[in-house]
Amino acid sequence: MNQEFSTTVSTTLVTQPLTVLSEEESLFAASVREFAEAEIKPYVREMDEAQKLRPEILAKCFELGLMGIEPGEEYGGSGGTFFMACLAIEELARVDPAVSVCVDVNNTLVINAFVNYASAGLRERYLPRLCQETIGAYCLSEAGSGSDAFALQTRAEDLGAHYRLNGRKMWITNGNEAGIFIVFANLDPAKGYKGITAFVVEKGFPGFSVGKKEDKLGIRASSTTELLFDDCLVPKENVLGEVGKGYKIAIETLNEGRIGIGAQMLGLAQGAFESALSYTKERKQFGQAIADFQGVQFQLADMAVKVEAARLMVYNAARLKDARQPFIKEAAMAKL
């Protein structure tokens, strides 16, 4: 069989490499790195030992637009992309994962849930606060419902003008810092997961309190707390999305959140690699830097390869999400 093949390469088939940033993305990432190096790095050890984030650093994150990267200016946001949010999370985690996780949860979980599911009234009431002044928390986990998230025991009861919440949430990131909470509770246990509904709870609502803060082994400046609901009254209009559709909000928002976690770990790994590389150049044995030993070079090379592989997976998942392409599998891979 004779066939003729064209030797001309069509440049229209060449797409932008995953790790090549646009000018806007590059400038944004550089500005976040500069902020992290200059204003966060000097306080990382202090915050970890105190197990508390410095309020002025969080205030600066709001000032720089890092707490609301995707929402438009009409909501006080930066009008950026999900990928840019991941760049910010990565650059912050490179210096301090505690600040990074706070920014991550606010962007990829809380704000995304409002953007995708909130009524116009809830968006207008809460998005400007989340973008400009108030940290959010995403409250799904309970003592008996971790991996099986929909086995939650927190209950909601319809009282007419209000819902009444009773129960306890565990291991909630930003628990101490947050003022706005997305809380998942079951309004009708007989319906199973179809009874789960998402509610917007504010810190000052009657019957709501923040409980014990976990004493963690790492990322200690980021608070991880329990939340207590004792006849907590929530206004009827504070249902996020539709009644009984909380499971859908939880699943789909967590898919985006997995990419954010991947970006956190990517930044942390990059920072660890840079620290290790710097140490090998300073540490001397047998009259030379240990970086000159081939065995050490092998280890550094392996580290660099793994970090770059992780970057490819995280960036790919984030860009797929922005392109409105299927990304669930890639998000799970990025988190791993």
Per-region residue spans from a language model:
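Alpha-helical interface subdomain recognition
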Residues: 1-105, 117-122, 133, 146-149, ...
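Short Ser/Thr-interspersed hydrophobic loop/turn segments at strand-loop and sheet-helix junctions
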Residues: 65, 89-93, 185, 201-206, ...
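Short beta-strand-to-turn element immediately C-terminal to the catalytic PLP-Schiff-base lysine
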Residues: 116-118, 157, 183-187, 200-202, ...
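A short, Trp-centered hydrophobic/proline-enriched beta-strand micro-motif
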Residues: 132-141, 184
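Short Gly/Pro-enriched turn/cap motifs at secondary-structure boundaries
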Residues: 144-147, 171-174, 188-190, 216-223
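A short core secondary-structure module
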Residues: 150, 162, 166-210
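Flexible, small-/acidic-enriched active-site or ligand-binding loops
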Residues: 151-153, 206-235
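Long, acidic (Asp/Glu-rich), low-complexity accessory segments flanking structured domains
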Residues: 230-249
